[in-house]
Amino acid sequence: MLLLPLLLLAVIVPGGDNEDVFQGPTSFHVIQISTFANSTWAQNQGSGWLDNLQLYGWDSDPGTTIFLKPWSKGNFSDEEVTELEELFRVYLIGFTLEVQDHVSEFQLEYPFVIQDIAGCELHPGKAVESFLKGAFGGLDFVSIKNDSCAPVPEGGSMAQRFYELIIQYHAICDTIAKLLLETCPRYFLSVLDAGKAELQRQVKPEAWLSSGPTPGPGRLLLVCHVSGFYPKPVWVMWMRGEQEEPGTQQGDIMPNANWTWHLRATLDVAAGEAAGLSCRVKHSSLGDQDIVLYWGHPTSTGLIFVAIIVSSLILLICLALWFWRRWSYLTIL
């Protein structure tokens, strides 16, 4: 455990340059979704994530991990990965049986779903904090933070009974503690290092403007779309000159399938006030060259489309003239 701060420093500050701030994922977590249809049928699904970037999935039939990136194992050996797979496989079998044995005691009614999320996250002070949360029907019932375990008050009596049940299994509690406090931070930091080239890449955003559904009579909804950028932090704002428009509404930053991000920023304005507005995009990949798109001006996509149409027409005219001249020449002969 004493090596973790040194590993963290090596990952966050490559080459010892304090100005090279890592802008990649700040958490790793595993999600478990267990569906119980009846007393004889249950299905367990699992996946591992760096923030919103999926690293692997769990194939429940053979009980093996499906790695989605070449560096998804971090610096863990094949033997360590196999050992963790076996541990997770045994855990899921025991978890399923244990839940089915206590359905009546906990007054559960089929079908139901239990969700767990466990992992570790990096805080601004460069400390790694581990966590585990369990939920039934979308309501949390148990929470573990570092080495502290407690029922969630919102979970009521069921949360208390589950907590009292789980703490009886000392071996399970010790295994969970080791996974959360030792294995998770070590894996998290190693996978950040193994995937550094991809996680620290810079991908420039693309931006375009459109109008959204009419908010009301005499009004316009201006939409600024920004997509394909990485890393995640981005600044998008509607502007009038150098002044920010306070009515700008920025949506959530959502992931694309190719590990980039997208979002949109909207502005509700009177139709007569749209002239002179622009959308400004700031992103680390752009340096000091912000993207600025002016409302009412042709976008680059529109210009490209027009250029293609014009070029195609010119080509067709040239071909027609060539065929006409050739036909005229052959007719004379």
From Swiss-Prot:
Query: What does the function comment of this entry state?
Result: Antigen-presenting protein that binds self and non-self lipid and glycolipid antigens and presents them to T-cell receptors on natural killer T-cells.
GO CC terms, sorted: endosome membrane; external side of plasma membrane; extracellular space; lysosomal membrane
Carbohydrate-modified residues: N38, N75, N146, N258
Q: How does it assemble?
A: Heterodimer with B2M (beta-2-microglobulin). Interacts with saposin C.
Q: Which PROSITE patterns match?
A: IG_LIKE
Keywords per UniProt: Adaptive immunity, Cell membrane, Disulfide bond, Endosome, Glycoprotein, Immunity, Immunoglobulin domain, Lysosome, Membrane, Signal, Transmembrane, Transmembrane helix
Lineage of this protein's species? Eukaryota, Metazoa, Chordata, Craniata, Vertebrata
* Domain Ig-like span(s) in chain numbering: 185-295
Q: Write out the residue ranges of the motif Internalization signal.
A: 329-332
Look up and give the organism this protein is from: Ovis aries
Return the protein name: T-cell surface glycoprotein CD1b-1
Q: List the disulfide bonds.
A: C120-C184, C224-C279
Residue ranges of the TM segments:
303-323
Q: Which InterPro entries match?
A: Ig-like_dom (IPR007110), Ig-like_dom_sf (IPR036179), Ig-like_fold (IPR013783), Ig_C1-set (IPR003597), MHC_class-I_related (IPR050208), MHC_I-like_Ag-recog (IPR011161), MHC_I-like_Ag-recog_sf (IPR037055), MHC_I/II-like_Ag-recog (IPR011162)
Q: What else is known?
A: During protein synthesis and maturation, CD1 family members bind endogenous lipids that are replaced by lipid or glycolipid antigens when the proteins are internalized and pass through endosomes or lysosomes, before trafficking back to the cell surface. Interaction with saposin C is required for the loading of bacterial lipid antigens onto CD1B in the lysosome.
Residues exposed to the Cytoplasmic side: 324-333
Q: How does it sit in the membrane?
A: Single-pass type I membrane protein
